[in-house]
Amino acid sequence: MNVAELKSRLQSSPDHSVSILLPDGDRVPRHFHVTEVGHVAKKFVDCGGTFRSSETCVLQALVGSDDHHRLTAGRLAHILELAKPILPMTDLPVEIEYEEGVISQFPLQEIIAEGASLTLQLGLKHTDCLAKDKCGMESGCCSDGESGEDEGGACCGDAGEGQGCCK
C-alpha cells in the first residue's frame, strides 16, 4: 500500500481508531504512537554488480507508558500531511517500523475496516538475490544439492568471471 492509498483510507474515516496487526497475528498494543514519518532512500549494488535503489515511507510505531492514548485515523492522516515536505511522491510504499525485542520493518499490506476501527495489516519482508541470472542461484549452487542446506552466502563468487556463487 502506498502513501496516497493510506491517506485516502484514513481521511475517509477520521474518527475511527487505528490498530496494527502484525504478520504473526499479534496486535501492537492499542496505545501506540506514530513517532516518526520518514522517507528512506536506499542505494545499493547487488552481487552481480547492478546498481539499484529503492524508496519507502516508514512510519515508526512506539508503545508508550500512557495506556489511555488512542490514535485516530484523522490524527494519523494529519501526521502524514505534516510529512508532505519530506515525501517526494505519494506512491511510495508504506512500511511500519516496530520494536519488539528487535526493530523490524513490515510492509503495509492492507487496511481492514472493523466497526469503528481501521486495522493496518502488516506483511513480511524477505531477503532475495537480485542477480540470480548472473550468480547461478537459479541452479541451486548455494545448496549442497542433497539436503538443500545453504553452503555459504548468496553470490560469494565473482559472477563477472563466470564463477557463480559459492564456487
Language model features with spans:
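Short amphipathic alpha-helices in soluble, non-transmembrane regions
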Residues: 73-79
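Cysteine-cluster motifs in flexible loop/terminal segments that predominantly coordinate metals
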Residues: 126-167
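Oligomerization/assembly interface segments of phage tail-like spikes and tubes
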Residues: 53-65, 122-124
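Small/polar-rich, solvent-exposed N-terminal microdomains that initiate assembly or binding
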Residues: 7-36
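Helix-rich interaction surfaces within compact, conserved domain-sized segments
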Residues: 82-134
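Short, solvent-exposed beta-alpha or beta-beta edge segments that form flexible loop/patches at the rim
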Residues: 28-50
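Short connector loops at helix/strand junctions that flank enzyme active sites
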Residues: 29-31, 52-56, 89-91
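Short, conserved charged micro-motifs
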Residues: 67-73
